[in-house]
C-alpha cells in the first residue's frame, strides 16, 4: 500500500492545518505514485462503464516489486508535467470514484499490527496553504469508509496466507510468468461491476490461495519436497 514520503504520524485526536484550493498540484508529477488497489480498480471501472480488466489495460501501468516480483498497478500519467491521466485542467474527471490514495490526501492510512490503523499526514508539498485547522478524526470520518476498513482487514488477512505461498513459488519456479499472471487475474481482474466488491474480493482471495497451494503440491509431486 502506498505510503507518502515525508510524512508524520498523527492521532485521531490531533489537529493539523491544511486547505485545498483546487490547484491540482498534487495531481501532477505523480508518475508511479498513485497505486491502484483492487477496490480502486473496481470502482473506477464501474464509474467509467467498462470492464475491470479493460480499465487496468487502458489506464494503468504494472510494476513488479523488487526482489519478490509481486505485481502492483499505478495510474498512467500524461504530458511533460506527468499529470494524472484523469486530470482535466484543474479538475478530477473521476471525482466520484477517485482512488483512496487521492481521496485521503494529504493523509494516508495503513493497518497496524493490533487490528487498528496508523494515520499519517503528508509534509512533502510546500504549496499547501496554511488554512483552517482540520481535525484528523473528522477527515477520516468523511473520507475513510466502512468498506475501506473492511478491505484493509481482508487484505491483511489474505496476504498473511498468500504471501508465504507466493514466496515459496517465486523461489522454486524457473519462470514466474504464470505465477504473476495468476496474481493479476485473481487479485485485480476477476470482478463484475454489477456485483458487490467485497464478496468478490473475499472469494478471489480464497480461490487464489487454493490455486497457489495446488501449484505447490504439483511442484512437490514432480520434484519432491
Residue positions per predicted region:
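Short loop/turn segments that flank or connect secondary-structure elements
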Residues: 1-225
